[in-house]
Amino acid sequence: MSKKPPNRPGITFEIGARLEALDYLQKWYPSRIEKIDYEEGKMLVHFERWSHRYDEWIYWDSNRLRPLERPALRKEGLKDDEEFVDFKPGEEVLARWTDCRYYPAKIEAINKEGTFTVQFYDGVIRCLKRMHIKSMPEDAKGQAREREQIAPELRLVTEVEPKEDWIALVKAAAAAAAKNKAGTKPRTSANSNKDKEERKWLKVPSKKEETSTSTIMQEVQKKEEEPTSSDTFVGFPIVDVPKMAFVQAESTLSHKRKSNLGNSFQAKRARLNKITGLLASKAVVADGAEKKEGNKETAPVLEQEISPKPQIQKKNEADISSSANIQKPALLSSTLSSGKARSKKCKQESGDSSGCIKPPKSPLCPELIQVEDLTLVSQLPSSVINKTSPSQPLNSPRSYKHSQRRRRSQRLATCSLPDDSVEKVSSPSSVTDGKVFSISAQNQQSKLEVPDVAHMSLEKRGPCLPLDLSRSSEVTAPLSTESTFRNEYPSKDKEDIQMITYLSSKAVTDGRVATTASAPSSHVHALHLELPLTNSLKLPKGSSKKKRSSTSVSSEGTEIQYSVPVKEKCFESLKEKILKNVIEKDKHSEVGAVRVERKGKVEEKSSTTYDFLSGKKKEKEKEKKEKKEKDHKSKQKKKKKKKKKSKQHDYSDYEDSSVEFLDRCSSPLTRSSGSSLTLRSMFSEKNTSYQYPRAILSVDLSGENLSDMEFLDDSSTESLLLSGDEYNQDFDSTILKSLRMKTMLSMKLLDAFVNWMKKMAL
């Protein structure tokens, strides 16, 4: 038997109708009717946003069901309460603004759609629904009237006043607000109003501000003529203020224009100085003529406009700029780069820029000195030029070209500087020290004609100059020593001494000052050992090819000869050098400087011989058969036994000399070189047959005898032979015997090592 659903307001009993249902957790959820069972009076309710497994059958008359739109019912109830209130046009109400708050407003009109046109107290007009308007209480209406008296410029228009006055007031307030926004910044506090107004009118008005103020003044004059709006602008000081402002603005404008002109002239002056320096460095032969003429004309004109100067200084500056532009780029490329570094260093050392441009007192090449001063002056700013430039006359371009040609002819003709000039160069200020030193180095290059040494000119090298001009203060001391060294020796040694001075200048500029010893021979020798070997300058290993006796190095020590590099030698020559180096170590253990130079070479040779010999051993050991090796070993043992028996009495005789020799070689330098030499001697391949030849050092390793001439031909041993003048005695018999002992000991060690290597290979 079917039942009828009950009449419940807000709930429609249809499939898909929405309502709220209470679940078993006693919470209300929006739900929907899925099915209706009319026989039992139940409904299948689905909770929205939940799974269908939570669907539940609920009786339609249960308290767990209620209508979904209960707030709407409340609004309807409020409407019912306020239906009796009826608003009229011109009535003061509380209207809702966009921030959901209610503000006092006035109803302008009632529209047919049921909306109200409302105007707020600030002049904004809106259309609102009935629900967004409330009636204003009586107390609030009185407060609104008090506000009218406090702010007369924003007076509220009541029903008594006509509608036109209200609109005019709103427009005037809007214009005033626009003016405040355009002209002034927002005010932070009422106390600083006067200060900010003064600042505002002190500012220079732009074109936009002038047009806006003029339009505002026109509007204000029009509104003053109207009788109704004349009282409303009592609080606005708009008419009087701009007239005062424009009077002050004109004075400030003129003042600012003057300051801007001064700043622009200063900027132009700095730009001029930069342009003159850049043109001097980048002058090209083709395009340079036009730029030079333009700079000649513009430089003195701008200098006259900037500041009143004496006529002498203006002429000097004009001559400086013109002569700096006429200089050729080949000369300027070397002088400009050095001038910047030197001017910076002078400012750091002396503290005042006038010390940088003092002319040197030396009589050396006055044209060169003028070139240096001109380039330096063109790089410095004009303020420094005004302080430092004296009223001395400068050469014209023609005389300058003439001096250049004369200087070139002097360079080609003489190619040398006097000794006095070299000594005087070190005396001037620190500005020109580095430059004069570089010039003297260039002049020395033309003198040097050593066949094995290739010189490059300083101009061709470009950026990689060997002279570091930032260290010009260090250059002065070695110059004086070299000049005195040059005066001591006659002209026959000029080529060698000049090469030494050129090298020492390189060493000085790299930070390594060459030490000068008391004896001239030690001075020359130390320079050869300490100077760096560059691509253009390489010192040979030994001295010349000539075969000289043990007195080849004279007591004066001034002759310095250069030899061709030693040719590559075969495997047997390496063995010969092993023995020679062992004996040389014993002879010349006192010569420390030579040892230091040879030490690295000996170690490199030992490493190369080890690799070469080890590879060759493996190849030969594979080719040999076991029988031949055994026979060879037996022969070697027999030879050793024979020589031990024959020379056994010599060992007891020379024990003391060998001990002295070991004590003498105990220094760290000789120890390291000796160890490398013994290793080299151990790495030789074949066993030795001990023969005592007629010469001192003709010991054979591979069955080939060495003659005296072949030994003395070696350049490495010849350079190490000591002269009789230094030691005043020749090698005695004890030294020769100790040498023989040393060679025999090294041969024994070599044999033991070879045997051990063969055993390891097997």
From Swiss-Prot:
It is found in: Nucleus. Coiled coil: none annotated. Residues 319-340, 383-398 have a biased composition (Polar residues). Pfam families: PHD20L1_u1 (PF16660), Tudor_2 (PF18104). Residues 193-211, 614-632 have a biased composition (Basic and acidic residues). Residues 178-231, 289-359, 383-411, 536-559, 613-651 are annotated as: Disordered. Its main location: nucleus. InterPro entries: Agenet_dom_plant, KDM4-like_Tudor, PHF20-like, Tudor, Tudor_PHF20L1. GO terms for cellular component: NSL complex; nucleus. Gene3D superfamilies: 2.30.30.140. Residues 399-410, 633-647 have a biased composition (Basic residues). One of its GO terms (biological process) is regulation of transcription by RNA polymerase II. Residues 11-71, 85-141 form the Tudor domain. Keywords: Nucleus, Repeat. SMART domains: Agenet, TUDOR. Is a negative regulator of proteasomal degradation of methylated proteins. Involved in the maintainance of pluripotency of embryonic stem cells. This is PHD finger protein 20-like protein 1.
